[in-house]
Swiss-Prot record:
Keywords, alphabetical: Activator, DNA-binding, Transcription, Transcription regulation
InterPro entries registered for this protein in UniProt: MotA_Tscrpt_reg_C (IPR015241), MotA_Tscrpt_reg_C_sf (IPR036474), Phage_T4_MotA_Tscrpt_reg_N (IPR015198), WH-like_DNA-bd_sf (IPR036388), WH_DNA-bd_sf (IPR036390)
UniProt GO MF annotations: DNA binding
Gene3D superfamilies: Transcription regulator MotA, C-terminal domain, Winged helix-like DNA-binding domain superfamily/Winged helix DNA-binding domain
Coiled coil: none
Name of the protein this chain belongs to: Middle transcription regulatory protein motA
Gene: motA
Summary of the function given for this chain in its UniProt record: Required for the transcriptional activation of middle promoters. Middle promoters are characterized by the presence of the conserved sequence [AT]3TGCTTNA (MotA box). MotA binds directly to MotA boxes.
SUPFAM superfamilies for the chain: DNA-binding C-terminal domain of the transcription factor MotA, Winged helix' DNA-binding domain
DNA-binding region per Swiss-Prot/TrEMBL record: 23-42
Keyword Nucleus listed: no
Length: 211
């Protein structure tokens, strides 16, 4: 069976061939744009691609982030289950190899930092759409993009991150002034990072609330 077939099977037939195909494309590249997805699938046609992206969003498997698209934790579970199904049927030795790999853990200090972040976000009037774990990172996703900010994150690599889109330069400057590093992608996505500590988390959220 093809990769698409295993994705469909792992989804318990929630997905069909087109939605599964597009989900795989989005999973391969974080923040891929709808235009880029259409370029990958000219055979499907723009209207079909757009429609199926909409279906994936409604099913909670894909989310918009600025102009980009990312898969959700639920979609990642489907993909992981599909890989397991493939291994069971075609290469059981892969399961042994995978069993030796340890997923990055959600550590106790991450939990503490996440709780502090959520407390401060609430205190400063930020309204959250949801909090989720994505690739062993805590994401506090705002209900509406605020001053370009989409997410506040507690990351497994020891950093706190702000993920934004087309943030104003003088707003970015306020964050870099407190020691955050900044990366700006060509598509307008902004990544602001700083080492996690209670002091830094409070400073970041204070600056964000004063923009």
């Amino acid at each position: 069976m093809s990769k698409v077939t295993y994705i469909i099977k792992a989804s318990n037939d929630v997905l069909n061939e087109k939605t599964a195909t597009i989900l795989i494309t989005i999973a391969k590249k974080d923040f891929i744009t709808a235009a880029e997805v259409r370029e990958v699938h000219p055979d499907l046609g723009n209207a079909v691609v757009n429609s199926n992206i909409g279906v994936l969003i409604k099913k909670g498997l894909v989310e918009k982030s600025g102009d980009g698209l990312i898969i959700t934790g639920e979609a990642q579970d489907i993909i992981s289950n599909a890989a397991t199904l493939y291994a069971q049927e075609n290469a059981p030795e892969l399961l042994k190899k995978r069993a030796t790999r340890k997923a990055r853990e959600i550590t106790s200090d991450m939990e503490e930092d996440k709780d502090l972040m959520l407390k401060l976000l609430d205190k400063n009037g930020f309204v959250l759409k949801k909090v989720e774990i994505y690739r062993s990172n805590y994401l506090a996703i705002l209900e509406k993009r605020t001053n370009g900010i989409r997410n506040f994150e507690i990351n497994n690599n020891g950093n706190m991150r702000i993920f934004g889109y087309k943030m104003m330069e003088h707003h970015i400057q306020k964050f870099t002034d407190i020691g955050m590093s900044c990366k700006i992608a060509k598509n307008g996505n902004v990544y602001l990072d700083i080492k996690r500590s209670a002091e830094n988390i409070e400073a970041v959220i204070t600056v964000a609330s004063e923009l």
